[in-house]
Amino acid sequence: MFEAIIYNISVMVAGIYLFHRLQYSENKRMIFSKEYVTVLMTFVSLLLAAYPIPFQNEYLVHLTFVPLLFLGRYTNMIYTLTAAFIVSLVDVFIFGNSIIYGITLIVIAGIVSAVGPFLKQNDIISLLILNLISIIILLFLALLSPIYELVEILVLIPISFIITIASAITFVDIWHFFSLVNRYENEDKYDYLTGLGNVKEFDRHLNEVSSKAEEKKQSLALLLIDIDGFKDVNDHYSHQSGDAVLKQMSQLLKNYVPNQFKIFRNGGEEFSVVIRDYTLDQSVKLAENIRSGVEKSSFHLPNKEVIKLSVSIGVGYLTQEDRKSQRKVFKDADDMVHVAKSEGRNKVMFNPIVKL
């Protein structure tokens, strides 16, 4: 029995490490993938099904439901039920387990996936709550069906909680470790708070786009976006609230900026968008859409308060005929931001170019 318990815990811990390691090896960035974790936890669940824990040479304790708790917490109902269905089929038709237990596994998957994403507790507590829900379902099964004895559930309770705690701690710790490694390896390119390109990457990208625009005789535009009154958010609420605003702002910008253009956080409360081969009207319209979108949006703070914000946007623009000067387009955009601020904020300002 002891060997089987160690095996089950080892399979879970090794599987969790493998998930993080494979994902990091593939893209060098820690981006949570529902597909990755579903494939992994399905495989781990099958390994646990192949090696149940014997007790008194009479009972077998199955822990195949534990990996499904992670799917219920971190993915959604479709992924969790798909994994449960696959595991149930293999468990019944290959490992010879009862079809009633297979159905119970699917019921557990459905319930934990409906509850898991909405739990407000931290990850470890949330997984323990899902484990408790699963135990209650299995207890109900033991009372109604002769195929599962009450003594098996009593043995299952401490073992399942131990493996859930060990797996949850491993999952969270390894995630934090690889996230720190990812942050260290990408700090020259990415802003760790928002995930956008940082000011170094902005300079490199603007230089690259300027060269391409010059070579292909295309226009070049730059939007500098500054959050109005951001210092007041930090001072009145907290720096944690300011960080929350920056994260939400970066997501809002992603919703408005076309995929072919890159967004950067230049530092503090300033963001930028580099645009190539757009007319001045198109560039100004994009800036106005962003300004209007921010004005209509609500920003949620960690203390549950909701605030409204605005942005001032400066547009720098070089026509197809202009020499593509990285310094000039930045200066024009920066000057226009200051004009927008002086004109009362919450404005888009640009310097119209008229050639006679």
Swiss-Prot record:
Major place of residence: membrane
Transmembrane portions of the chain: 2-22, 35-55, 76-96, 99-119, 124-144, 151-171
Pfam families in the cross-refs: 5TM-5TMR_LYT, GGDEF
Keyword Transmembrane: yes
Top-rank taxon, per record: Bacteria
Biological processes, Gene Ontology terms: cell adhesion involved in single-species biofilm formation; cell wall organization; negative regulation of bacterial-type flagellum-dependent cell motility
Membrane association type: Multi-pass membrane protein
Domain GGDEF: 218-353
Intracellular or extracellular location(s): Cell membrane
Keywords, alphabetical: Cell membrane, Membrane, Transmembrane, Transmembrane helix
CDD domains for the chain: GGDEF
A GO CC term attached to the entry: plasma membrane
InterPro entries: Diguanylate_Cyclase (IPR050469), GGDEF_dom (IPR000160), Nucleotide_cyclase (IPR029787), Rev_trsase/Diguanyl_cyclase (IPR043128), Sig_transdc_His_kinase_LytS_TM (IPR011620)
GO molecular function terms noted in the UniProt entry: diguanylate cyclase activity; phosphorelay sensor kinase activity
Descriptive protein name: Uncharacterized membrane protein SERP0413
